[in-house]
């Protein structure tokens, strides 16, 4: 995965490319940001740029060729100088895993220019494993770089965070995700509908099929319509049950189902705002349901529309804080 193939994050990718080219890459870095937005791919791009046999140098930047023997082996996960550490079956990264890569990192690269240790989901490091990293992060081997990839940097020990500069990766734009999906064979309509509910995560967009996301959108649309005409709390709470219906992958949790419905609802409410404000309908994320959107626009306009959009955002944030799933669904329908 050369730098040029990473979707979005242009400023950070340019910074990494310049750092590799100028030999100014810090010996340890935290790549932080939401799940599924390309942090791990960016880390692999660094590893390729450091070890590519035929790198392309353009002024003050560098990029891997992506096709040489070294790049191919890194992409396949079999390069001896690129070590990937991931959580085990129990969901954590144990101290033995960390000790092994620390020992290997002390030696000169076997065949490349620099060893790269990529710790994916670094927030899964148990406390003992994090503590075992401290000395290495404080006095890193000159021929190695440690890249800690995490969606929850706040769970890392302060002593770990203080030793590693942090790069903050932001959610991808819906346009970036739609382009990536179309490159994978999605129609433009499908790609835009999926991207609108992906919450800035290409990984999330790729995990769910277009059909699953359309089902989720139908549920969200139906709940908005039902709640808009319900005058008493009892009827609204009945609608909350629909938000907990199973939509998506078979192994998904109730929290996952509610989350996908709320992201679909957020996408619909954004489109409603487009119609209410008289903006160009060509920017709608869900143009195939424009008649239904226009009916919702008759209700969710002005202050009520703004309150509904804010309530959905707050509900999604509450889910991320592990609030009770049923409690979040019930609270939301009473706010819409």
Show the residue positions of the predicted features.
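Conserved alpha-helical scaffold flanking the Walker A/P-loop in AAA+ ATPase domains
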Residues: 15-19, 95-116, 124, 128, ...
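Post-Walker A helix-loop "phosphate-sensing" segment adjacent to the P-loop in P-loop NTPases
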Residues: 48-63
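Loop/turn-to-beta-strand initiation segments
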Residues: 111-116, 141-147
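AAA+/P-loop NTPase substrate/partner-engagement loops
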Residues: 61-93
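Conserved catalytic/switch belt of AAA+ P-loop NTPases
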Residues: 131-145
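Flexible beta-alpha connector loops of hexameric P-loop NTPases
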Residues: 88-95, 122, 166
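Conserved Walker B
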Residues: 121-125, 153
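Charged, glycine-rich active-site and insertion segments that engage polyanionic ligands
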Residues: 1-49, 70-73, 106, 142-145, ...
């Amino acid at each position: 995965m050369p730098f040029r193939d990473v979707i979005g994050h242009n400023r950070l990718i340019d910074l990494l490319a310049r750092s590799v080219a100028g030999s100014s890459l810090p010996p340890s870095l935290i790549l932080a940001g939401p799940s599924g937005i390309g942090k791990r791919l960016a880390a692999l791009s660094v590893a390729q740029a450091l070890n590519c046999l035929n790198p392309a140098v353009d002024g003050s930047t560098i990029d891997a060729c992506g096709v040489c023997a070294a790049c191919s082996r890194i992409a396949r996960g079999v390069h001896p100088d690129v070590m990937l550490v991931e959580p085990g079956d129990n969901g954590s990264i144990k101290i033995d895993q960390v000790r092994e890569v620390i020992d290997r990192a002390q030696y000169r690269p076997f065949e490349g220019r620099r060893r790269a240790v990529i710790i994916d989901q670094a927030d899964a490091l148990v406390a003992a494993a994090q503590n075992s990293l401290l000395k290495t992060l404080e006095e890193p081997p000159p021929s190695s770089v440690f890249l800690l990839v995490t969606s929850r940097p706040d769970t890392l020990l302060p002593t770990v965070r203080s030793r590693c500069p942090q790069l903050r990766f932001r959610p991808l734009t819906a346009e970036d995700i739609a382009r990536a999906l179309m490159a994978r064979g999605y129609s433009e309509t499908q790609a835009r509908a999926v991207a609108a509910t992906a919450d800035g995560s290409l990984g999330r967009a790729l995990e769910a099929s277009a059909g699953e996301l359309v089902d989720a959108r139908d549920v969200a649309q139906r709940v908005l319509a039902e709640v808009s005409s319900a005058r008493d709390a009892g009827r609204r709470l009945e609608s909350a049950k629909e938000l907990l219906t199973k939509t998506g992958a078979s192994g998904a949790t109730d929290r996952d189902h509610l989350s996908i419905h709320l992201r679909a609802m957020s996408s619909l409410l954004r489109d409603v705002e487009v119609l209410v404000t008289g903006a160009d309908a060509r920017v709608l994320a869900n143009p195939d349901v424009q008649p239904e959107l226009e009916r919702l626009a008759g209700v969710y306009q002005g202050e009520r529309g703004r309150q509904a959009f804010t309530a959905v955002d707050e509900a999604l944030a509450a889910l991320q804080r592990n609030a009770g799933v049923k409690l979040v669904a019930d609270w939301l329908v009473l706010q819409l």
